[in-house]
From Swiss-Prot:
InterPro entries in UniProt: Ala_racemase, Ala_racemase/Decarboxylase_C, Ala_racemase_C, Ala_racemase_N, Ala_racemase_pyridoxalP-BS, PLP-binding_barrel
Sites where the protein binds substrate: 135, 319
Protein name per UniProt: Alanine racemase
Originating species: Helicobacter pylori (strain HPAG1)
Stored PROSITE patterns: ALANINE_RACEMASE
Active site per database record: 37, 271
Keyword Disulfide bond found: no
Name of the gene this protein is made from: alr
Any one of the GO CC terms: cytosol
Length: 377
């Protein structure tokens, strides 16, 4: 039984389909790290991870310690990498929970080494190389090779992997992405020349997987990190139009009509004066608001699907509730409303909502609140 009259519906079959799409593209002997940060981009990290592991994922990737600890409590043996920054104070929890950490400096590695020695355990780390994202990482140069040698000499650490991140592999012209891979491959080869090898070498996110697996840029990679494509979205609209891979929608935001009321002509609906009734108006109230992830700016801007009919979202979205206009709509209290999701039900999908807000589908789905129950079909 639902605890609220609003929820996120997650299509399990679509999650499986999208993971299979990844497997059909990457080399047959490749390892796959399913990226499940931000509550699996809104799909629910535990259940999504369970599905990906069933389908053959070798590793799980998250952004922060709390996400990793949540997964570890359900998957005691699964390799989990924290792709984001891990503060030094987190070292003991990383070690005690057998989590892998991203490292980008000798100073950070030294602290982790000291903590590992103190606990008499080993900490797995993946070294981050900055090839053009200009966010975190060691530069791919001779100085960094010397730094890596020093890190490898530290006791208590297991240098399990090395990776970089592509910043715009979804661009129509792949020059920058290919230059990033050229720099990364050259750096890996320099390390190999000095007998420095890594169990895992990775660079490709969803955009890289969808657009760069047909060349030789990935010749030294053996691990791939799909993220947004697992949840049914292409990294950009341009890639959606040009990519032959079919991805299926996973996430739908739904709510029930909790009350229908008739509002006379000449009234304002909701906070402020953002919707004026120029006729007698049938208003449906939904128990869903911007605290749940339905952006406030969507009021008066989108249509939602009710019984395969389109109804306007009116007024400003409140923190916990919103309004739909039901004039000429066949609906009753308790009926389901699709705010966004499956196109077959005439609803907008998350990428269309994102376009209205001048953002991307990543933000639309990953900001769906945890207070919304995830319902898996």
């Amino acid at each position: 039984m639902l605890k609220r009259a609003s929820f996120v519906e997650v299509n399990s079959a679509s999650l499986r389909h999208n993971f299979s799409a990844v497997k059909s593209i990457v080399p047959k002997d490749a390892h796959i790290m399913a990226v499940v940060k931000a509550n699996a981009y809104g799909a629910g990290a535990i259940k999504a991870s369970e599905i990906f592991l069933q389908e053959g994922a070798n590793y799980l990737g998250v952004a922060a310690l709390d996400e990793a600890l949540e997964l570890r409590s359900h998957f005691p043996k699964t390799p989990i990498l924290i792709l984001g920054y891990s503060p030094n104070a987190n070292a003991s929890m990383l070690i005690d929970n057998d989590l892998s950490a991203m490292v980008f400096s000798l100073e950070q590695a030294e602290v982790f080494s000291q903590m590992a020695l103190k606990s008499q355990k080993r900490l797995k780390v993946h070294l981050k190389i900055d090839t053009g994202m200009h966010r975190l990482g060691l530069e791919p140069n001779f100085k960094s090779i010397e730094t890596i040698k020093k890190i490898r000499a530290l006791k208590g650490l297991e240098i399990e992997g090395i990776f970089t991140h592509l910043s715009n592999a979804d661009a129509k012209i792949k020059t920058h992405a290919k230059n990033q891979m050229k720099a990364f491959n050259a750096f890996l080869e320099q390390l190999l020349d000095q007998k420095i090898e890594f169990q895992y070498r990775h660079a490709y996110n969803s955009a890289g997987i969808l657009s760069l697996c047909n060349g030789n840029e990935n010749r030294l990679l053996n691990l791939y990190r799909p993220g947004i494509m697992l949840y049914g979205f292409y990294p950009s609209n341009g890639m959606k139009e040009s990519c032959p891979t079919i991805l299926k929608n996973v996430i739908s935001l739904k709510a029930q009509i909790v009350q229908i009321r008739s509002v006379k002509k000449g009234e304002f609906i909701g906070y402020g004066e953002h919707f004026y009734t120029n006729e007698e108006t049938l208003v449906g109230v939904l128990a869903l608001g911007y605290a749940d992830g339905l952006m406030r700016a969507l009021g008066n801007r989108i249509q939602v699907a009710i019984n395969n009919q389109l109804a306007p979202l009116i007024g400003k979205v409140c923190m916990d509730q919103c309004f739909v206009k039901l004039n000429d709509i066949q609906a009753k209290e308790g009926d389901e409303v699709i705010l966004f999701g499956d196109k077959s039900a005439r609803a907008n999908d998350a990428s269309e909502i994102a376009a209205l807000l001048n953002t991307i589908a990543y933000e639309t789905i990953s900001t769906l609140s945890k207070r919304l129950e995830r319902v898996y079909i």
